[in-house]
Amino acid sequence: MFSAQDTLAKVDPELWTAIQAENRRQEDHIELIASENYVSHAVMEAQGSQLTNKYAEGYPGKRYYGGCEHVDVAEQIAIDRIKKLFGAEAANVQPNSGSQANQAVLMAFAKPGDTIMGMSLAEGGHLTHGMPLNMSGKWFNVVAYGLDEKEEIDYDAMERLAREHKPRIIIAGASAYSLRIDFERFAKIAKEIGAIFWVDMAHYAGLIAAGYYPNPVPHADVVTSTTHKTLRGPRGGIILMKAEHEKAINSAIFPGLQGGPLMHVIAAKAVAFKEALTPQFRDYQEQVIANARVMARVLGEERGLRIISGRTESHVFLVDLRSKNITGKAAEAVLGSAHITVNKNSIPKDPEKPFVTSGIRIGSPAMTTRGFTEIEAEQVAHLIADVLDAPQDEAVLANVQAKVAELCARHPVYGK
């Protein structure tokens, strides 16, 4: 029998110490990695529940194990909520990650050797959309589209490539693209050539749910997403699809890729979906975009840095660092020492290697969750620029770190 007195701190103090150190880092650092966010206490409570004990291969009402009557309720709640949130005909909430959701789409609609088309990773796409080292690039013939001279998606070139190569699947979505994507235009060319149209909305899902970014669901055959990032749920994946594709997608997830789903994570997803259906979540997403725009404006117009694509229409943007004679790798490290967390990121036509890069990616979801508004966003942008202007100046770094501490103290992630 387990005792409630046997806490993690008592059972495994070594791990407890590491967790507490990470908690302090999250509280004391300004998080600007676009793919990261903070979940609510309610989400964490669901994820730490007894549902972690239950094995439940299959789907609600059709399991391979007994005793699933209560986890069936939890999963159906998650399905119903995510369908309502995006206006989807059908949904699968079992993917353990966005990458596994994407693999399921490829398994459902393509055979090894088929042609797929996605956005070039070097110009803002995602590795699961055809990167040579990823299974999507190893198993399929990949045709990549990219950006035009204005660093916007080259829709004309995309259409020419689609007509020429006639891919089985056309993928829209990105991990480092700041502008709105014209999903309707993608859908038209997919329909013209008879391709499956798949949207990976992982980065934009929360914005879409709140109505601040185009919704791909009416246009796409299938839509995948993570449940963290802007959606502010636990780490995991989802798939939305037309009803006609539900059987193929469900079979691709189970038994195709996964066995028993993580029921505690599905419960946590359900909580996050409920939170996303509230007016407060819509207000949050409006602030996410406002904060990103302020940071991009300050860094670009006031501090002399080049913003890729010239602006942001979402939660994220890339910064070209070459004018400062600093690499993305070095900028990530020095900003981290000042308690500002970003990630190095390749920019279009980047001369540096992917682990060095000429740019950084900046996102506003996490800082907005802790209550930052345009006022703090402007301050943060200036702090970033201060560090980039004098990365070797210890006095500057100490001053920035002190100001970061003040901002974080005024806006804790988890209040008491």
Curated annotation (Swiss-Prot):
Keyword annotations: Amino-acid biosynthesis, Cytoplasm, One-carbon metabolism, Pyridoxal phosphate, Transferase
Family stated for the protein in its record: Belongs to the SHMT family.
Q: Which gene encodes it?
A: glyA
Write the protein's name. Answer: Serine hydroxymethyltransferase
**InterPro entries xref list:** PyrdxlP-dep_Trfase (IPR015424), PyrdxlP-dep_Trfase_major (IPR015421), PyrdxlP-dep_Trfase_small (IPR015422), Ser_HO-MeTrfase (IPR001085), Ser_HO-MeTrfase-like (IPR049943), Ser_HO-MeTrfase_PLP_BS (IPR019798), SHMT-like_dom (IPR039429)
Task: Tell me its EC number(s), please.
Answer: 2.1.2.1
Organism of derivation = Aromatoleum aromaticum (strain DSM 19018 / LMG 30748 / EbN1) (Azoarcus sp. (strain EbN1))
NCBIfam families for this protein: PRK00011.1
Q: Where in the cell is it found?
A: Cytoplasm
